[in-house]
A protein has these predicted regions:
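Bacterial N-terminal signal peptides that target proteins for export
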Residues: 1-8
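C-terminal motif of bacterial Sec signal peptides marking the signal peptidase cleavage site
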Residues: 14-17
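Surface-exposed short loop/turn segments
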Residues: 60, 65-120, 124-142, 146
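C-terminal/domain-edge helix-coil "capping" segments
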Residues: 135-167
Length: 167
């Protein structure tokens, strides 16, 4: 065990020496990456339920402000979802669906409206059709919820990379 620790020590010191640091390093809630996220206002998102889910996930992940007067940045997101049957039986009934959620986002300065960064993220999941229509509906909603959280997490990572480089 001691030999393993001694072998890892030079690697850790080398990474520290070259300026490596984790993107979302936490020193409590005072970490710089966490503080900048708190200044982002997430605009309401169209798209019915999934837009609501994406916005709430973004607010939770970013711990963003819900007040436009204290925000430094505005995040606007547009979502598009598609559902297509991927497993079709010989009698033309569908037994599995593919759910695709795409989001295009734009981060802008709240004061002058200048676009700072923008991008697109996509996530794909699937769900089965079962005998119970209610169970199938719940599976679809679960795919939407998981997709919304995944999209929000991907956007958070993109924004973290942007702020790490343009701080």
């Amino acid at each position: 065990m001691r030999a393993h620790a001694l072998a890892v020590l030079p690697v850790v010191l080398a990474l520290q020496g070259c300026g490596f640091h984790p993107l979302f390093a936490r020193a409590g809630d005072d970490a710089q990456g966490q503080q900048i996220f708190k200044t982002i206002y997430v605009e309401p998102i169209d798209g019915e339920r999934v837009g609501y889910e994406v916005r709430n996930s973004l607010i939770d992940l970013l711990r963003g402000t819900q007040k436009t007067d204290s925000a430094l940045y505005r995040l606007q997101v547009e979502v598009k979802q598609t559902i297509e049957g991927v497993a079709v039986q010989t009698n033309a009934s569908i037994t599995r669906y593919r759910y695709t959620l795409s989001a295009t986002y734009e981060l802008a300065d709240m004061h002058d409206g200048k676009t700072l960064t923008k991008g697109t993220e996509t996530t794909v999941s699937g769900y089965d059709v079962v005998a119970s229509p209610y169970a199938t509906l719940v599976a679809q909603q679960d795919a939407q919820r998981l997709g919304a959280h995944d999209i929000a997490d991907r956007i958070r990572i993109d924004l973290g990379v942007f702020f790490a480089h343009h701080g």
